[in-house]
Structure formats: C-alpha cells, structure tokens
C-alpha cells in the first residue's frame, strides 16, 4: 500500500491506522523510492534538467516544478541508469521570512510521519544546527529524522532559517521533506563529497 505524502498538508485526511513498514511505501506527487522518474517526466526532460550536484558523480538529480503541493521536488537517481529509478525524493516549501510558520508546519508533518512510520524507525528529534553553506554562521536549520531500523533509509524533515545576508540574495526560509533510500543515505554519508 502506498501512502501519499503529497497530501501531508491536509493533515486530518490521514487515518491513524495507516502504517508504512518500508521507505518505498511513502509517495510524493505519485512517485516513490524505487519508481522510475519516467512515470512523470519524459526522458528528454530528464536529460535536459539532469545535474550532478555532488563531488562524486554517482547520483544525478532533477528538480521538478510541476507539483500541486510543493514549490519544487528534487529526485535523485544513479547517473548511468537509463530507467531513472528514484533513490531520493526531496520536497520543498518556501516560507518567505517566516521561520515560525515553517517550524509549525514541520511539527505537523513530523507528527503525521511519526504516526505512519514511528513503529518501524528510530526518531532523532529537532536540534538547532548551523547551516554549513552560510560562512557567516548566521543561518540555522532544525532537522529531525526517522531512520528505519532494518537499514539506513530515512525520512528527514527540516526548516532552514536563512540569515539576512542570504535573504537579500533572494534565498528564503524553507521546509524540506527528504525521503532517502538506504543506498542514497549511505552515498551521502560515505561517498558524496569524496
């Protein structure tokens, strides 16, 4: 059974009995971990929009804007995979100069995620951290994660409170919901920046 995270923002439409035992049971805008990106994009669109954002080029990404719920969704897949099987889904919502609303929405989403996968995961609560991409040390993120117990697949939810310097460069406070397969989590931890 697939669970539609795309409607997370309609929080009360979820029933408390819906459970997901595996990361591939979670779905965003019709796509789950293990699906082909060809389900929603043509191969030409994928190739035209494909980029490798990590030092290690093992995975490529595509940013998808034709979404009903989010401002953008980033999908990652093996660079040499012509089937474009999805290993990571990262959905983003913009909160212009409004970290308070972002954190409120994060809490709502985390509560729903906990109901869905809490019995099968270890929960790591919100912990304010410096945002490494801001050399001024004035931007912060508030991550929390649900890591599946049978592997390293996870759901991470976090808000970023960008500093005024970044906001003046047209960066905005944002909420991200990331769904990472075991392979992608291990890639980020051990290979992405080598």
Sequence positions of predicted segments:
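Short intrinsically disordered, low-complexity segments
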Residues: 1, 10, 55, 64-65
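Sec-dependent N-terminal signal peptides
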Residues: 3-17
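Non-cytosolic coordination micro-motifs
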Residues: 21-59, 90-194
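Mid-chain, structured segments of secreted extracytoplasmic proteins
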Residues: 62-108
